[in-house]
Amino acid sequence: MGNKCSRSKVKEPKRKDIDELAERENLKKQSEEIIEEKPEEVVEQVEETHEEPLEQEQELDEQKIEEEEEEPEQVPKEEIDYATQENKSFEEKHLEDLERSNSDIYSESQKFDNASDKLETGTQLTLSTEATGAVQQITKLSEPAHEESIYFTYRSVTPCDMNKLDETAKVFSRRCGCDLGERHDENACKICRKIDLSDTPLLS
């Protein structure tokens, strides 16, 4: 029913194979005929023909081996020295770059630390006095009831930046109690966003 297995098929010889087989058979017949006529001479000729290519192959192999052994010795020393110098110079450049970057980072961090220490000592006092005044005014606007203060500790958290307090910024918004400085964004302010502006007059 099914197709025959293609693996079990014996391959038919191609035309070239047929020609080669015919030539081999002819050579065998000729050699047998010659051997029957003059067996001693034929044996000597066959041995000589077999020995000659073997000797030639051995000589060629020996020459190749000798050439391969001589090749590594012929590499000029100048090329080796140049390659090692390139490697050293590349490594030295890489190390110098690393040292520079590390020293730059270290010096910048030192500058930053020194500057931050100065800022902390000098400006902390001014910020604390200005901020306490602002916090006192904010707490007056939104002071919790007496009962709530017992249960909750009051923290004054303003969504706006309190670092820039100048004379014009000390005017507080009626909507959220934040300072109306340059950094006050009413769209980003959590308190300003929740206030309904439909009833309030426009602020100038």
Swiss-Prot record:
Membrane topology reported for the UniProt record: Lipid-anchor
Broad class of where this protein is predominantly found: membrane
Skewed-composition ranges (Basic and acidic residues): 9-53
Spans annotated as Disordered: 1-86
Keywords: Lipoprotein, Membrane, Myristate, Palmitate, Phosphoprotein
Lipidated residues (N-myristoyl glycine): G2
Phosphoprotein found in the keyword field: yes
PTM statement from Swiss-Prot or TrEMBL: Phosphorylated at multiple sites. Phosphorylation increases during the schizont stage and peaks in segmented merozoites. May be phosphorylated by PKB. In schizonts, phosphorylated at Ser-89 and Ser-149 in response to phospholipase C-mediated calcium release. Phosphorylation at Ser-149 begins in early schizonts while phosphorylation at Ser-103 begins in late schizonts. Phosphorylation at Ser-89, Ser-103 and Ser-149 appears to be dispensable for GAP45 inner membrane complex localization or GAP45 inclusion in the glideosome complex.
Acidic residues compositional bias, start-end: 54-73
Subunit relationships: Component of the glideosome complex composed of GAP50, GAP45, MTIP and MyoA; the complex is formed during the late schizont stage and in merozoites. MyoA, MTIP and GAP45 probably form an initial complex in the cytoplasm which is then recruited to the outer face of the inner membrane complex via the interaction with GAP50. Interacts with GAP50; the interaction is independent of GAP45 phosphorylation status and can also occur independently of the formation of the glideosome complex.
Protein name, UniProt field: Glideosome-associated protein 45
Organism of derivation: Plasmodium falciparum (isolate 3D7)
Gene expressing this chain: GAP45
